[in-house]
From Swiss-Prot:
Residues 208-243 form the UVR domain. One of its GO terms (cellular component) is excinuclease repair complex. The UvrABC repair system catalyzes the recognition and processing of DNA lesions. UvrC both incises the 5' and 3' sides of the lesion. The N-terminal half is responsible for the 3' incision and the C-terminal half is responsible for the 5' incision. Its main location: cytoplasm. Coiled coil: none annotated. This is UvrABC system protein C. The gene is uvrC. One of its GO terms (molecular function) is excinuclease ABC activity. PANTHER family: UVRABC SYSTEM PROTEIN C, UVRC/OXIDOREDUCTASE. Pfam families: GIY-YIG (PF01541), HHH_5 (PF14520), UVR (PF02151), UvrC_RNaseH (PF22920), UvrC_RNaseH_dom (PF08459). Belongs to the UvrC family. Gene3D superfamilies: 5' to 3' exonuclease, C-terminal subdomain, GIY-YIG endonuclease, UVR domain, UvrC, RNAse H endonuclease domain. It comes from the Bacteria. Interacts with UvrB in an incision complex.
Length: 676
C-alpha cells in the first residue's frame, strides 16, 4: 500500500485558488474527486494527521499514489467540473447512489405521424415529450388506461400498427373506444395529433380548460337531445376528475417544485424527492446514499450539495439529449429543473449552486428551506418517507448481510480456505448437440451478483461442427479468463489508459465450474499450467448437489456433501444457477441469429439497411419471393441488377436477359445507386 508521504505535494506548490482535485491509485485509476474553495487548505488537510481522518477517507489516502488538481476561476466552474469528472471516472470513494434504477417515464412520440403513448426508460430523444418519472411502470399504465377513455390515443407498437393497417381491422382497444384507430383511418393524422396534444395538456396541468370544454359539449349535447353523447361526455368528465383525485393538490398557488428530504445514520442516508408540478405531486423517487466519510462531506448541507449536483446534472443531460421539437417544446411539466427546490438546509455554497441550477434551467431557480404552511407540511411528509425508506433498507440489509456472512463462512470452513471467498466466479457451458457452443462466466462479490463483471465466450477450439467436449470447453474458458488476468497484472500501465478500472485485474478467491471431477480437474490443470496457486477450484454437480474438489486435494477424493439447509450450499446453487441462466441466454441469442439468417445475406452489395427495407416493404421473405423484378425495384435504392440477384438468392429462376436489356439494367441500377 502506498505511503502518503511519497506523493504529498511539496510545501507551497499547491495553489490557494478554487479548483477540483483527483486522487489516483498506483494503476492510475481515479479513486476520488473533490472540489475546494482553496486547494491548498483542502489538500493539506488530507496529509496533516492521518489518525484524525474518517476511516473511509484514511483508506482513500492510503490507497492513492498520486494527487493532481485543476484550478478554475469560480466555484460554479468547480461545481460543474467536479460533476463531469465523477460521471466520467466513477471514483470508488465518492458518494454513490445505490438502487438508482432507471425510473420509467411516460413518453409521447410527437415526432411520428401518428404519435404513440408508451412506457420508456433511457436517454431522451428529439421530438418526444416526457412526463414523469414514475416510481413504477404500472402507475404509468394505470394512468394511460384511465385517460385513454377520454383521449383515445394510440398505444401500440409500430409493428402492431402496420399489421392492423394491412388487414384493415382495428385492435381490441379500437373496438372498445380506447383508441381512435388511426391505423384504419377512423380519424385523420391531424385529428389524432390533436387528441394526443389534449392528452399532453391534461398531464401538463392544463386541466380546468379541458374539463370546462367537456362540460360545455355535454350541455350542448343535452340541449340537442343527444342524450347518449351527453352521457358519454359525463362519464369522460368523471374519469378526468378521478385522475385528478389521484394527484392531490398540495400547493394551492400551483407551484412547480421538487421537495428533497434526507434521513441518515453514521454510514448511509436515504434521499426522497417529491416532484410537484402545477401544485400536484406528479412523481416520487428515492435513493440510498453511501456516506463517504470525507471531512465536512457527511453533514446535511454537503449531502444536499452532492445530491442536487448529481441529480440535476443527470436530468439536464437527459433533457439536452432529447430537446423537443416544434409543437413538443419543453414546458414547466417536463423541465428537469423546477422553479423551486425545497431542501432541509442550505449548503455553504448555496449561491453558486443556485446559479448553476439556474443555468441548467435557463431561468431563475430558488433554493429554499420550507418554513411554514403547505410547503412545510409536504416537506415533513417527504422526510417521513425518507426515514421509512432508511429503516426498511437497514432491516433488509441486516437480514441479507447476516445470511451472506453465514454463507461465506460456511464455504470457507467446508473447503478449508484461509479467507472467506469474497469474490466467487463460476463458468457454465451451453449448447444443443454440439452446435452454438458457448460459455458464461458470472461473478459474485460479498455474496451478491456483480453483473458488470459478467462475461460470455464463444467456444473456439474445443467444439464446433456438431461436436462438443464439455471438459475441454471448461479448460479453454479457464485458460482465456486467467490468461487475461495474468496479462493485466503483468502490464499494469494498460489499466490506466482512461483512468478507469479493468475488472479482470481482480482474481477470484473461489472458482466454481458446473460439473464433477473431470471438469474440476481440467480447470485445476489450467491454473497449474499458468502458475496460479491462490485460487481455489471446486465443481458443483447437479446430482445430489455434490461439491467436488481437484484430485490430490487435502479434502480427499470423495465429493463433499453440504447440509441441505446450509447457507453455503444455497449461495453456491445461486451462483451455479445464475451461470446456467446467463449461458442459456447467450446460447439462445446466438442460435436465434444463426437460425434467422436470411438468404438475402448472401446477396452481394445488399447491406443490412436495404435488406430491412425489402422485408419491411413486402412483409416477409415469402412475399418477396413471389414478387417480380419490377415490384422489387419499387423499393427505394433497389435497382434491376440487385432485384434479380435477390430473386436468384431466393431460388427463383430468372430468364437470361438480352445483352441490350442487361446493359440497360446495369445503367438503371447505377443511376438508382447514385440518386438513392
Amino acid at each position: 500500500m502506498p505511503d502518503p508521504s511519497t506523493y504529498r505535494p511539496a510545501p507551497g506548490s499547491i495553489p490557494v485558488e478554487p479548483g477540483v482535485y483527483r486522487f489516483r491509485d498506483p494503476h492510475g485509476r481515479v479513486i476520488y474527486v473533490g472540489k475546494a474553495k482553496s486547494l491548498r487548505s483542502r489538500l493539506n488537510s488530507y496529509f496533516a494527521d492521518l489518525s484524525g481522518l474518517a476511516p473511509r477517507t484514511r483508506q482513500m489516502v492510503m490507497t492513492a499514489a498520486k494527487v493532481e488538481w485543476t484550478v478554475v476561476n469560480t466555484e460554479v466552474e468547480a461545481l460543474q467540473l467536479e460533476y463531469n469528472w465523477i460521471k466520467e471516472f466513477d471514483p470508488r470513494f465518492n458518494i454513490r447512489y445505490r438502487d438508482d434504477k432507471s425510473y420509467p417515464v411516460l413518453a409521447v412520440t410527437l415526432n411520428e405521424e401518428f404519435p404513440r403513448l408508451k412506457v420508456y426508460r433511457g436517454p431522451r430523444k428529439k421530438g418526444v415529450r416526457y412526463f414523469g418519472p414514475y416510481s413504477h411502470a404500472w402507475a404509468i399504465r394505470e394512468t394511460v388506461d384511465l385517460l385513454t377513455r377520454v383521449f383515445p390515443a394510440r398505444t401500440c407498437s409500430a409493428g402492431v400498427f402496420k399489421r392492423h393497417n394491412q388487414i384493415d381491422r382495428p385492435c381490441l382497444l379500437g373496438y372498445i373506444d380506447k383508441c381512435s384507430a388511426p391505423c384504419v383511418g377512423r380519424v385523420s393524422a391531424e385529428q389524432h395529433r390533436q387528441i394526443v396534444l389534449d392528452f399532453c395538456d391534461f398531464l401538463a396541468g392544463k386541466t380546468d380548460r379541458l374539463v370546462r370544454d367537456l362540460e360545455r359539449k355535454m350541455t350542448a349535447a343535452a340541449e340537442d337531445l343527444d342524450f347518449e353523447r351527453a352521457a358519454r361526455l359525463r362519464d369522460d368528465i368523471g374519469a378526468l376528475r378521478r385522475a385528478l383525485e389521484k394527484q392531490t393538490v398540495v400547493f394551492g398557488d400551483g407551484t412547480d417544485a421538487d421537495v428533497v428530504a434526507f434521513a441518515d445514520d453514521d454510514l448511509e442516508a436515504a434521499v426522497q424527492v417529491f416532484h410537484v408540478r402545477g401544485g400536484r405531486v406528479r412523481g416520487q423517487r428515492g435513493w440510498i446514499v453511501e456516506k463517504s466519510g470525507e471531512p465536512g462531506e457527511s453533514g446535511e448541507g454537503q449531502l444536499v450539495e452532492q445530491f442536487l449536483t448529481q441529480f440535476y446534472g443527470d436530468q439536464a443531460e437527459l433533457g439536452s439529449a432529447g430537446d423537443n421539437a416544434g409543437d413538443s417544446g419543453q414546458d414547466e411539466a417536463t423541465n428537469p429543473v423546477p422553479r423551486q427546490v425545497l431542501v432541509p438546509c442550505l449548503p455553504d455554497n448555496a449561491d453558486e449552486l443556485t446559479e448553476w441550477l439556474s443555468q441548467l434551467r435557463g431561468s431563475r431557480v430558488a433554493l429554499r428551506v420550507p418554513q411554514r404552511g403547505d410547503k412545510k407540511a409536504l416537506f415533513e411528509t417527504v422526510q417521513r418517507n425518507a426515514k421509512e425508506a432508511l429503516a426498511q433498507h437497514k432491516l433488509k440489509r441486516a437480514g441479507d448481510f447476516t445470511a451472506r456472512t453465514a454463507a461465506l463462512q460456511s464455504i470457507q470452513d467446508t473447503l478449508g480456505l484461509a479467507d472467506a471467498p469474497l469474490r466467487i466466479e463460476c463458468i457454465d457451458i451451453s449448447h444443443v448437440q454440439g452446435t452454438d457452443v458457448v460459455a458464461s462466466l458470472v461473478v459474485f462479490e460479498d455474496g451478491l451478483p456483480r453483473k458488470s463483471d459478467y462475461r460470455h465466450y464463444a467456444i473456439r477450439e474445443a467444439a464446433g461442427d456438431g461436436r462438443s467436449d464439455d471438459v475441454a470447453s471448461i479448460a479453454e474458458v479457464t485458460r482465456r479468463r486467467f490468461y487475461r488476468h495474468l496479462h493485466d497484472t503483468q502490464h499494469p500501465t494498460e489499466l490506466s489508459a482512461e483512468g478507469k478500472s479493468r475488472k479482470f485485474a481482480y482474481p477470484p478467491n473461489l472458482f466454481v465450474v458446473d460439473g464433477g471431477a473431470p471438469q474440476v480437474n481440467a480447470a485445476q490443470a489450467v491454473l497449474d499450467e499458468l502458475g496460479i496457486s491462490d485460487v481455489a477450484v471446486i465443481g458443483l454437480a447437479k446430482r445430489l448437489e455434490e461439491v467436488w474438489v481437484p484430485s490430490g486435494s487435502d479434502l480427499g477424493p470423495e465429493p463433499i456433501i453440504l447440509p441441505r439447509n446450509s447457507e453455503g450450499l444455497y449461495l453456491l446453487q445461486r451462483v451455479r444457477d445464475e451461470a446456467h441462466r446467463f449461458a442459456i441466454t447467450y446460447h439462445r441469442s446466438k442460435r436465434s441469429k444463426r437460425m434467422t439468417a436470411s438468404a438475402l445475406d448472401s446477396v452481394r452489395g445488399l447491406g443490412e439497411h436495404r435488406r430491412k427495407a425489402l422485408v419491411t416493404h413486402f412483409g416477409s421473405v415469402a412475399r418477396l419471393k413471389e414478387a417480380s423484378v419490377e415490384e422489387i425495384t419499387a423499393v427505394p435504392g433497389i435497382g434491376v441488377t440487385t432485384a434479380r440477384a435477390v430473386l436468384e438468392a431466393l431460388g427463383v429462376p430468372q430468364a437470361a436477359p438480352a445483352d441490350s436489356d442487361t446493359a440497360a439494367a446495369v445503367i438503371d441500377d447505377d443511376q438508382r445507386r447514385v440518386t438513392g
